[in-house]
């Protein structure tokens, strides 16, 4: 027992067990160090291989000129020596000589886009040569520069139709251009409009002059352009149609026959202001009277 009265455990008895543990720890440390040394040797070998790979890459890329301006980067990426050489070897992916690989076109993106627009084969496949732009005459130059979506029109617009007094060239240019395949709406010709408006003018000119003399208006000159052609109706009947209405509003009394004539003229004037109307077959008034008899 020691001075404090505690039993002495005897340290010499613990030395063999502690020494064995130390030896095991030392052996494990040596083993770990050996593994680390092996890893370092492998890393050194990998570094040597990487140096060899870098040297081979330098040899392969020795003919490249990497000192380029920013504008020439697209040319370097598209038409590099390695890719162009492989494309020209005649392999399965050989596309032949490509015109857009030149530096002049690739230096400017707008020129490259214009090259693509010009060289697309869809222009020659979609339709015949007559439908290409520039193959035929420019129809927009006709009719005072007004764009005509369905081609040229031989007839000029009627003086009473809305095409002559309606929207000008600026409004028509804003409308979407229709293709020739979408002609669903009937386009009225000037002949139909002329027969719809002036069917009673030739046979009623004499009665109209008599009525104007009775009302007190000066007689109008004879209708000389009636035989010239149906494409150019004279605007004189429209003035005469308004004159009985004006005289009636002024307070003059008219005979029943004259009132019927005025009503017929006013209805004809109303028809002339409508551009969308159903096309009916023209039948002269004399033929209608014969059919009733």
Swiss-Prot record:
Q: Where is this region: Disordered?
A: 1-26, 120-186, 200-293
Assembly notes: Interacts with GPHN.
Bias category Acidic residues: which stretches?
200-215
Spans of biased composition, class Polar residues?
A: 171-180, 243-256, 264-286
> Pfam families, alphabetically?
DUF4589
Write the protein's name. Inhibitory synaptic factor 1
Q: Where in the cell is it found?
A: Postsynaptic density
Lineage, opening ranks:
Eukaryota, Metazoa, Chordata, Craniata, Vertebrata
Q: Report the GO terms under cellular component.
A: GABA-ergic synapse; postsynaptic density
Q: Which residues form the signal peptide?
A: none
Q: What is its main location?
A: other
> What keywords sit in the KW lines?
Coiled coil, Synapse
Q: Which residues form a coiled coil?
A: 30-63
Give the matching InterPro entries.
Answer: Largen/INSYN1
In the record, the note on similarity to other proteins reads:
Belongs to the INSYN1 family.
BP GO terms, sorted:
inhibitory postsynaptic potential; postsynaptic specialization organization
Function in brief: Component of the protein machinery at the inhibitory synapses, probably acting as a scaffold. Inhibitory synapses dampen neuronal activity through postsynaptic hyperpolarization. This synaptic inhibition is fundamental for the functioning of the central nervous system, shaping and orchestrating the flow of information through neuronal networks to generate a precise neural code.
């Amino acid at each position: 027992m020691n001075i404090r009265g505690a039993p002495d455990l005897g340290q010499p008895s613990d030395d063999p067990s502690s020494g064995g543990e130390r030896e095991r720890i030392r052996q494990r440390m040596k083993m770990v160090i050996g593994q680390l040394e092996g890893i370092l040797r492998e890393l050194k070998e990998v570094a040597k291989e990487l140096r060899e790979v870098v040297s081979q890459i330098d040899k392969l890329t020795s003919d490249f000129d990497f000192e380029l301006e920013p504008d020439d980067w697209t040319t370097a990426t598209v038409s590099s020596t390695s890719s162009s050489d492989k494309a020209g070897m005649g392999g399965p992916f050989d596309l032949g000589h490509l015109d857009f690989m030149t530096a002049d076109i690739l230096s400017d993106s707008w020129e490259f886009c214009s090259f693509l627009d010009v060289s697309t084969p869809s222009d020659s496949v979609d339709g015949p040569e007559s439908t290409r732009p520039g193959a035929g005459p420019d129809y927009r130059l006709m009719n005072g520069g007004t764009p005509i979506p369905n081609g040229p029109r031989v007839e000029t617009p009627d003086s009473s139709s809305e095409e002559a007094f309606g929207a000008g060239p600026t409004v028509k240019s804003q409308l979407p251009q229709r293709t020739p395949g979408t002609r669903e709406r009937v386009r009225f010709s000037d002949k139909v409009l002329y027969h719809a408006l002036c069917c009673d003018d030739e046979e009623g000119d004499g009665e109209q002059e008599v009525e104007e003399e009775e009302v007190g208006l000066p007689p109008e000159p004879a209708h000389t352009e009636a035989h010239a052609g149906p494409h150019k109706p004279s605007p004189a009947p429209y003035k005469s149609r308004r004159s009985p209405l004006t005289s009636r509003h002024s307070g003059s009394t008219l005979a029943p026959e004259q009132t019927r004539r005025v009503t017929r003229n006013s209805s004809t004037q109303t028809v002339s202001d409508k551009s969308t109307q159903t096309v009916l077959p023209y039948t002269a008034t004399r033929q209608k009277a014969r059919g009733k008899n």
